[in-house]
């Protein structure tokens, strides 16, 4: 009886009436599958999801948290990380204290500042004092320093909370305001923070050495105040003779300026296109197909808009795809459409591809039926079928019209089997987890669950996929997260 009761209690429906699961049957996997898709959710919702995972397996929950923040090897989520850090400080401080030393390594030094005013404040101040002393010694020796000084608050900041926090940190370091300001100024000069140059209208810096976020954020200032030199640099980037950092810049951030505004200048188009083309290729050369959700629910009031994230990832992958589906993706809402990317630059490509979004319902069933119907009609051999299908969506699918008692994945498995085809590996990529529901369960075969805005996820999915849980363990069990424990 208990077995059947658990099964029944785990069934729910999407916003569009499809049968689906409340949980994968693993709280940790539920968190892993959605932690990159919680940007629009309330703090309480975020911490509740983490709490459940922590209760199931504290170590896995902590590894998932640091994977979510990891700007070099993970998915680079800042707000969800900081929200959970504060919850840990108030509820599981000992667990958090074991990992405080890794916070800046996986994220930034200012992530630590959310712990001020909590029971972990002393540990944070001790770490800051230790690192600042090491940086000052390195400065005197002419060696490189950390980015701590960049992210510490200034005593002359415009924000009152930042000033109050800066004064508190200064006193804990045994410094008055002047000493603190002088120390940070010297270290920031060594770091060569571009904001200092902009404030002083000093455009003698090297563009190739600037961080990716700053280069994109301040592009208008560069065009306005250093137009010729900036143009020349971006031209060299486009030619491949100059380096432009794009490591922490997400694809959606690059195309976001194309929406909700008037004309964009030729100069800005050229700069954004060069930036787009400089992105690292995480695709891996598989014969895979990207399917992006263009339904109405993908246009909810979030920043970023889920539809923009999905479109950016779809174009990113299709352009770099070396398989049979190079330069193609499928967009779906009421009716799936195979879209060939057209345009001379990323601005034109986005404008062209975006108009295929129907902004209607979310009929994923028709996507798989289109793929299978095409294969059957043309007697396509299994080897020519896509090896993987990436479904980038909010997972609020329509119900199966053929059998509304089945989940979409169950229906698709049965459909392919009935026609003698093996279902390609399916990657459910969540970009907006509004509800606690999952399209598959923990041990379903040939499927993975991921989330977020980061194209690095494509590289994690290169190998053969066994099950959602196996994929999660492959990621979190890597050497990268070995030191993170609860």
Regions found by a protein language model. Name each.
Residues 1-309, 319-486:
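Long lumenal/extracellular ectodomains of secretory and single-pass membrane proteins
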